[in-house]
Amino acid sequence: MFNNLQDKLDSAFKNLKGQGRITELNVATTVKEIRRALVDADVNYKIAKEFTDKIKDKAVGEKVLNAISPGQLMVKIVKDELTELMGGEEVPLNTKGSPAVILIAGLQGSGKTTFSGKLANYLKTKKGLNPLLVAADIYRPAAMEQLRVLAEQIGVDVHIEAENKDAVSIARSAVASAKSKNKNVVIIDTAGRLAIDELMMTEVANIKNAVTPQEILFVVDSMTGQDAVNTAKAFNDRLDFTGVILTKLDGDTRGGAAISIKYTVNKPIKFVSNGEKMDALDVFYPERMAQRILGMGDITSLVERAQQQFDEEQAKKIESKIRKNKFDFADFKAQLEMIKKMGNMKDLLGMIPGVGKQIKDLDISDDSFKGIEAIIDSMTPEERSNPDLINGNRRKRISNGCGKDIAEVNAFMKQFEQMRDMMKNMNKMGAFGKMMPGGGIGGIKRP
């Protein structure tokens, strides 16, 4: 995420490396490169200029404490200003209503229908609400079918009137149905267009007037950069939405939309969406995003995801086995499954400070650990629960069973033993009481 921008900002900060203090000259040079990096990231020049002028004003004359370098001080100033530019603080979704109505709008292909499903899943699993999805795209039967499939996948009800060609009528009857079924949130997926046009605007405006939504969320594809910002502005000028959703952020190497959109439309970014999985949706926190743009990681979000996925009872059970030095392959695979549920692997690793830059060119997919799983699945139950049983002959059989070279199996076994030794040493030092639930998995490379 935002790798190109990260690299260019890093290069800009290097101007201050080795400098004893901040001066007008070295600030001017650094600020010029930051501005160029932002413009290259598809940030509007006016926004980039105003942003860097603020940085310059704050940086010039700042006293550098002995504990930090001029470069570190500049990074902090840029982080604070980026945070402010993107909204300053999280703005929660308004779900007050009987039921609360959330209208989803956006261009065709922006990820609008997928986001509708993700939002329903988020409200059901994270907020304990009972949502109803509504298919109000009367022009694309495929969109109705997609929403039906997503609703079935996440276990929520969906309102579809396939023969009704009046989107306003569908929205009205869906809200009435939600009231009768004690649904507390209605999510209406409206029709998209290839471009903003009068028909689209009028239809969404009519739905808005008919059902008085608590939220109107405009979904934009972050990979379209400044085009996304311009589209959001045109839509907001006409319909005054309440928040922005950025989709496909995992494929955005530039970051122009995330940085510019709040400034341009003066509406908060409420969620960011990564990938196709229904749980791949994050609340937007400006400060955390600023940290990620600057390559500082996002440990807070990483820990939150871990806490959501790790089962406390299972964590205690595994910790007990670690303390007794009885951690086995079955435990390892169980932990692996929980980590996979946390989201896109490359995205997760990018939340660790300093790691994002190191892995940017690596091919790390959600299938990264399939080789490890294949090796473990080729073991007998007895072998999984007793790693010490696995001798040379058993390794050959496991290699044949999983289709992996014997060298890969041996390498995994060696790494597993090293990890168990590390756990044993950490146990002696009492380190496990300070770790996140389940102890985590460290040191294992994918075969």
Which ranges hold each PLM region?
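Alpha-helical transmembrane segments of polytopic integral membrane proteins
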Residues: 184, 188, 204, 342-345
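Primarily NTPase-proximal linker/entry elements flanking Walker-type ATP/GTP-binding cores
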Residues: 8-136, 143-190
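Short, glycine/polar-rich helix-capping loops at beta-to-alpha or helix-loop-helix junctions
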Residues: 141-147, 228-231
